[in-house]
Amino acid sequence: MTDFGRVITAMITPFTADGAIAYDVAAKLAQHLVANGSDGIVVCGTTGESPTLTWEEEFQLFQTVQQAVAGKAKIIAGTGSNSTREAIDATAKAAELGLDGALLVVPYYNKPPQEGLYAHFQAIAKAVPDFPLMLYNIPGRTGQNLLPETVIRLAEYPNIVAIKEASGSLDQASTLRAALPPTFRIYAGDDSLTLPLLAVGGYGVVSVASHLVGLRIQEMIQAFVQGDTAKATAIHCQLLPLFKALFVTTNPIPIKAALSLQGWSVGEPRLPLTSASDAVISQLKAVLDDLGLLKS
């Protein structure tokens, strides 16, 4: 059974001042994440600015992070695309490179019907039958909701082992949990819904906030799993202002700004994303300071 772990960080992609990928910083950041609560890392997902990376950059980044982590965490490649052919090729490459799995976003912009979504993921699963795959449902970005009945059909493929459920619907996650075996893992796609999702049968989170508070998120999940719901709730409430602050504008703008405030040289997002505004930076400073996450 594939286990990607409870806390998976959707890692940012650091850039140099001239906009090239800072592979050395990526390696250091990956090591830092694994030492601070991350069981797995998604490389080149939404938070990693995959739409503005070339496939060549992505493949090099996969290898950089894989080598840096050296088996201490699961490395999951963001290989989704709104072109089925491209998604198959990229996922096959990730498998060839020896990564631990792939995160496959629902095809965006072209808005396939449910049967098209089924055929898309089916084709990828058949192309890499021994490679673990995590579906990624985020209708707010893709324009299309991967419905539970489609996920249930796809889960019949043994290498489709999990879903990052970022629809924001606990009812949708509950429907999946009721219909699928516990070996099919449901991950929160929003930090603020990690604890609520656990309550309806979720397994963990693909997190942005874990760049900053991975150990606390891990502690929250473990408290819930061990039956200490009061402790889990207390941690959730303590971290909620951070969870919300990291999404006051488009991800990954706030998390990159927060990491910069902590001293990481992660650079600015690539266009069409922009730098954090003064107002966003001010809000982040206040929240980070309240949680003791800024160096004095």
Swiss-Prot record:
Alphabetical keyword list: Amino-acid biosynthesis, Cytoplasm, Diaminopimelate biosynthesis, Lyase, Lysine biosynthesis, Schiff base
Main location (coarse class): cytoplasm
Active-site positions on this chain: 136 (proton donor/acceptor), 164 (schiff-base intermediate with substrate)
Site location (Part of a proton relay during catalysis): 46, 109
Signal sequence segment: none
Membership in a protein family: Belongs to the DapA family.
HAMAP family named in the record: DapA
Alphabetical list of PANTHER family matching this protein: 4-HYDROXY-2-OXOGLUTARATE ALDOLASE, MITOCHONDRIAL, DIHYDRODIPICOLINATE SYNTHASE
Protein name as catalogued: 4-hydroxy-tetrahydrodipicolinate synthase
Top-level taxonomy: Bacteria, Bacillati, Cyanobacteriota, Cyanophyceae, Acaryochloridales
